[in-house]
From Swiss-Prot:
Classification via SUPFAM superfamilies: SpoIIaa-like
Protein name as it appears in the record: Prestin
Topology of the protein relative to the lipid bilayer: Multi-pass membrane protein
Organism of origin: Homo sapiens (Human)
Motif range (Involved in motor function): 158-168
Chain ranges inside the bilayer that never cross it: 242-253
Disease cited in the entry: Deafness, autosomal recessive, 61: A form of non-syndromic sensorineural hearing loss. Sensorineural deafness results from damage to the neural receptors of the inner ear, the nerve pathways to the brain, or the area of the brain that receives sound information.
Function: Voltage-sensitive motor protein that drives outer hair cell (OHC) electromotility (eM) and participates in sound amplification in the hearing organ. Converts changes in the transmembrane electric potential into mechanical displacements resulting in the coupling of its expansion to movement of a charged voltage sensor across the lipid membrane. The nature of the voltage sensor is not completely clear, and two models compete.
Residue ranges, Cytoplasmic side: 1-75, 127-137, 197-206, 283-291, 368-370, 407-410, 465, 505-744
């Protein structure tokens, strides 16, 4: 069989033939029978809600304590090795990040270790993701540090501070108190949102928004770390233009940089960059990524202790790491009114980052995460953790990739990582007291590489979507210069405005028919597509509501070229001209009405006398005109039907319904029918609820599809032509005749 025969057979088998009636809405409803649905009464719903069965109790436990579902099904032989390797790899990364992110949060380093321990244990019981790593995250830590520095600035005067050391300790204690308060409030917000099933709020933080926000946060983190890398003493700034002030402060003090601190930092920086490139290039051959950050911490601590860098070269180090866990403490709730804006921003950003990474890894491994339960889990981790003096946590992107990439199967890997942190807190913390802050600064800056790579989004969005590019840029700029809290608020407002813009300014298309098919496509896109004579098909790809209803009406007239007002005016002008030509001045005042009015024959133009004044009845303008009048007709005057394609309209509000009713009436006044094609059940309900079908005859305007509407229009016109061409009956010729009396 040659290719020509194959193509013939393929073409024959790819055709379909359907024979059915033209489905207007009434005809289709006659063929359908609605299923009887008996709605549950309120009493039945309450009874069902408060009914207690073993299965229901089990499902509730599974929902709020996911560990009770996956732990009994734990496949020990398959999972234990992967969880063990993953836990160790994540733990050695979590140690330096916990210390470094505490610097971002403007609290002593030990509190970064607390935040790497308590929340991880709680998330193991409460979280639905098996792979993400919970704990300190650079962006959230920076936001915590921003509010802590705003309320407790570097130059604050602490009453009772005898010397600089005591003053610094008192200042740090106040910042810890602020961090605990904002962490508690953000946790309460997350928990309440989860209980109220508001997990969907993450959808308002679109990917361009999140990526623009995290890129701006990366710039904030980078500028915050420069002072530690250069070893200079500068004031820490927060709020509007803080990134500018921080950069200027570092540059002004660059002449005072600590060469030893910079040298150690650059050495670690180069080691980490080269090592990460090695890990990436040979990741298929390595059983696990080399824990570069841990080696950097060990090496930096060893060099600092061996050469006594703190005393000999005045290098800033981590300092005291007290052993043991602190007893629970009550956060200061009196600060809530000062930090609620920051708490809301931290709660939303923390959840958005967490659910984004959780869904990515869940899709990769074939399971689902519950956004509402993730909110509850984060809320409890933060609110309960604040009692143990932790600061707000989230999902760490870099640690999550390590935990998943090294073979982690469940959150037992996270538990093992937290136990390693506990070992440092209880026994070995003093070993890291000589660690230079420049090493931690280099670790943080290197881990920002992935966020800085998001600048490559700009050419991508430039090619694909200017609106998403606008969201990215406005989010980045506002978050960079207004601060992360107000920047996020601005970004969300901009994102919502783009939604309004998209629906207010949708694309409008005039459709034509692909010959010998029932397919209707944009006539401006393809040469083969042709308009059907006398019919205009108009499509919108958005809902019709108060923000775009007038624009829709205007676009309909502009795109189709059929404007009822223009047609009416042209007809009046033509009639006046025609009246003058036939010498009948009174006809110039005649009224033009729709074509299907019930006026026929000579009586249609026969004058009547009333109170001595001669009046003419309305003149009927049909689809054909004398040649003398046709010269004055506008281009759209030969159109008899406008079909509105509603297949892409998902709702229409009361303002849209009024606009639609006005369109139907306006076109009807000049003898043009308006059909609605492809209305969804929701749109039909909206039209019914807003009394669009108050006149039952309007149901005849609804058609199941564009093709049904086209065929219905053509059938109507054919019947009208047949009726017009039929010879008049005897009764029409002799309207006053009386029927003959039959003979007896």
């Amino acid at each position: 069989m040659d290719h020509a025969e194959e193509n013939e057979i393929l073409a024959a088998t790819q055709r379909y033939y359907v024979e059915r009636p033209i489905f207007s809405h009434p005809v289709l409803q006659e063929r359908l029978h609605t299923k009887d649905k008996v709605p549950d009464s309120i009493a039945d719903k309450l009874k069902q809600a408060f009914t207690c069965t073993p299965k229901k109790i089990r499902n509730i436990i599974y929902m709020f304590l996911p560990i009770t579902k996956w732990l009994p099904a734990y496949k020990f032989k398959e999972y234990v090795l992967g969880d063990l390797v993953s836990g160790i790899s994540t733990g050695v990364l979590q140690l330096p990040q916990g210390l470094a992110f505490a610097m971002l949060a403007a609290v002593p380093p030990i509190f970064g270790l607390y935040s790497s321990f308590y929340p991880v244990i709680m998330y193991c019981f409460l979280g639905t993701s098996r792979h993400i790593s919970i704990g300190p995250f650079a962006v959230i830590s920076l936001m915590i540090g921003g509010v802590a520095v705003r309320l407790v600035p570097d130059d604050i005067v602490i009453p009772g501070g005898v010397n600089a050391t005591n003053g610094t300790e008192a200042r740090d204690a106040l910042r810890v108190k602020v961090a605990m308060s904002v962490t508690l409030l953000s946790g309460i917000i997350q928990f309440c949102l989860g209980v109220c099933r508001f997990g969907f709020v993450a959808i308002y933080l679109t990917e361009p928004l999140v990526r623009g926000f995290t890129t701006a946060a990366a710039v904030h983190v980078f500028t915050s770390m420069l002072k530690y890398l250069f070893g200079v003493k500068t004031k820490r700034y927060s709020g509007i233009f803080s990134v500018v002030y921080s950069t200027v402060a570092v540059l002004q003090n660059v002449k005072n940089l600590n060469v030893c601190s910079l040298g150690v930092g650059l050495m670690v920086f180069g080691l980490l960059l080269g090592g990460k490139e090695f890990n990436e290039r040979f990741k298929e051959k390595l059983p696990a990524p080399i824990p570069l950050e841990f080696f950097a911490v060990v090496m930096g601590t060893g060099i600092s202790a061996g050469f006594n860098l703190k005393e000999s070269y005045n290098v800033d180090v981590v300092g005291t790491l007290p052993l043991g866990l602190l007893p629970p403490a009550n956060p200061d709730t009196s600060l809530f009114h000062l930090v609620y804006v920051d708490a809301i921003a931290i709660a939303i950003v923390g959840f958005s980052v967490t659910i984004s990474m959780a869904k990515t890894l869940a899709n990769k491994h074939g399971y689902q995460v519950d956004g509402n339960q993730e909110l509850i889990a984060l809320g409890l981790c933060n609110s309960i953790g604040s009692l143990f003096q932790t600061f707000s946590i989230s999902c760490s992107l870099s640690r999550s990739l390590v935990q998943e990439g090294t073979g982690g199967k469940t959150q037992l890997a996270g538990c093992l990582a937290s136990l390693m942190i506990l070992l440092v807190i209880l026994a070995t913390g003093f070993l890291f007291e000589s660690l230079p802050q420049a090493v931690l600064s280099a670790i943080v800056i290197v881990n920002l590489k992935g966020m800085f790579m998001q600048f490559s989004d700009l050419p991508f969005f430039w090619r694909t979507s200017k609106i998403e590019l606008t969201i990215w840029l406005t989010t980045f700029v506002s978050s960079l210069f207004l601060g992360l809290d107000y920047g996020l608020i601005t970004a969300v407002i901009i994102a919502l405005l783009t939604v309004i813009y998209r629906t207010q300014s949708p694309s409008y298309k005039v459709l034509g028919k692909l010959p010998e098919t029932d397919v209707y496509i944009d006539i401006d896109a393809y040469e083969e597509v042709k308009e059907i004579p006398g019919i205009k098909i108009f499509q919108i790809n958005a809902p019709i509501y108060y923000a775009n209803s007038d624009l829709y009406s205007n676009a309909l007239k502009r795109k189709t070229g059929v404007n009822p007002a223009v047609i009416m005016g042209a007809r009046r002008k033509a009639m006046r001209k025609y009246a003058k030509e036939v010498g009948n001045a009174n006809m110039a005042n005649a009224t033009v009405v729709k074509a299907d009015a019930e006026v026929d024959g000579e009586d249609a133009t026969k004058p009547e006398e009333e109170d001595g004044e001669v009046k003419y009845p309305p003149i009927v303008i049909k689809s054909t005109f004398p040649e003398e009048m046709q010269r004055f007709m506008p281009p759209g005057d030969n159109v008899h039907t406008v079909i509105l394609d509603f297949t892409q309209v998902n709702f229409i509000d009361s303002v849209g319904v009024k606009t639609l009713a006005g369109i139907v009436k306006e076109y009807g006044d000049v003898g043009i029918y308006v059909y609605l094609a492809g209305c969804s059940a929701q749109v039909v309900n909206d039209l019914t609820r807003n009394r669009f079908f108050e006149n039952p005859a309007l149901w005849e305007l609804l058609f199941h599809s564009i093709h049904d509407a086209v065929l219905g229009s053509q059938l109507r016109e054919a019947l009208a032509e047949q009726e017009a061409s039929a010879p008049p009956s005897q009764e029409d010729l002799e309207p006053n005749a009386t029927p003959a009396t039959p003979e007896a």
